[in-house]
Amino acid sequence: MRMNIYNNGIYQQDIESAWKLGNFNKLEGSRILITGATGMIASVIIDILMYYNSIINISSQGIHILAVSRNEEKARERFAPYRDSDFFTYFSHDISQPLPELGDIDYILHAASNTHPRAYATDPIGTITTNVSGTYELLSYAAEHYCRRFLCFSSVEIYGENRKDVDKFGESYLGYIDCNTVRAGYPESKRLSESLCNAFAAQKEQDFVIGRFSRVYGPTMGKDDSKAIAQFIRKAAAGEDIVLKSEGNQLYSYTYVVDAA
């Protein structure tokens, strides 16, 4: 699915539409570090920014992207069209470890995380350390290098289970999470990553924003994505029956990936 994404007319139209909605001139000359670069949302953000770079005047300063992920082979394939661009730099790094010296970074987008149930189950330690240690290391770098803004990719999972006292969650809602389960590592560590942002703002005056993304879907979903919506789409595309593991009465918010980006 990802191999042919640059040849998909619908996806390219979506990228162009997203560019038209943004005011990217304000980012001219900026250096933007994006972690989890090959992930569902981050890869779309990179495509949008690189689309902007492809149509700007030759004298423009452009937007410089530093893309970070763990799987270099996957990244080389995903971002092959940008390999020779002066505006794109990729490096492989475990963000739970301190960053190498990269110079000043204007914006950091922390999108690296295990984001589907199978990953939580098979790599619970990595899930927690990426969300907690990774956020700490990135915030530390941001604070030391006068980063203008830090964007933390969080999740609606921080709201926990509905206590049956509301029909819809507000931003201040906190439901139940059983912390003595492996599955709790994801929402609990996302909660802590948000707390770290607030701590750095209070102690280091680091500017930040948090995006609590709902259930995101779209063409950049990985083939190994085990979330329900990903399974539903794969089944439907293959002409197979969709299998529900519940009565299907729950109400969820879904966001198309380009809208999320």
Residue ranges and their predicted role:
Residues 107, 123-137, 180, 184, ...:
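Glycine-rich NAD(P)-binding loop of the Rossmann-fold in SDR/ketoreductase-type enzymes
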Residues 81-97:
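Rossmann-fold cofactor-recognition segment
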Residues 92-130:
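NAD(P)H-binding glycine-rich loop region in Rossmannoid oxidoreductase-like domains
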Residues 136-184:
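Conserved Rossmann-fold NAD(P)-dependent oxidoreductase catalytic core, especially the SDR/UDP-sugar
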Residues 31-51, 55:
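N-terminal Rossmann NAD(P)H-binding glycine-rich loop of SDR-like oxidoreductase domains
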Residues 162-172, 185, 195-261:
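NAD(P)-dependent short-chain dehydrogenase/reductase
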Residues 1-33, 47:
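Non-catalytic terminal and boundary segments that flank Rossmann-like NAD(P)-dependent oxidoreductase
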Residues 35, 68, 108-114, 150-156, ...:
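SDR active-site strand-loop-helix element
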